[in-house]
Amino acid sequence: MLYYALVFLIVAIIAGVLGFGGIAGASAGIAQVLFFLFLIFLVISLVAGLIRRT
C-alpha cells in the first residue's frame, strides 16, 4: 500500500511540474489538434462503412 502511495505522489509531482509549466499550453494545443483529426477520421470511417453496405 505504501508503494502505491509513493507512486501516486511521484505522478502528482510530475503532473504539477508539467501543469504549472509552459508545457501544459502546448500539450493542450496538440491534444485539440489530435481530437479534431481523429474526429474527422471517425466521420470518414462511418461514411465509408455506409457506402460499402449499400
Swiss-Prot record:
GO cellular component, one term: plasma membrane
Main localisation: membrane
Pfam families (alphabetical): DUF1328 (PF07043)
Membrane association type: Multi-pass membrane protein
Subcellular location as annotated: Cell membrane
UniProt entry keywords in alphabetical sequence: Cell membrane, Membrane, Transmembrane, Transmembrane helix
Keyword Membrane attached: yes
InterPro entries: DUF1328
Residue stretches spanning the membrane: 5-25, 30-50
Family: Belongs to the UPF0391 family.
Name of this chain's protein: UPF0391 membrane protein R00741
Lineage: Bacteria, Pseudomonadati, Pseudomonadota, Alphaproteobacteria, Hyphomicrobiales
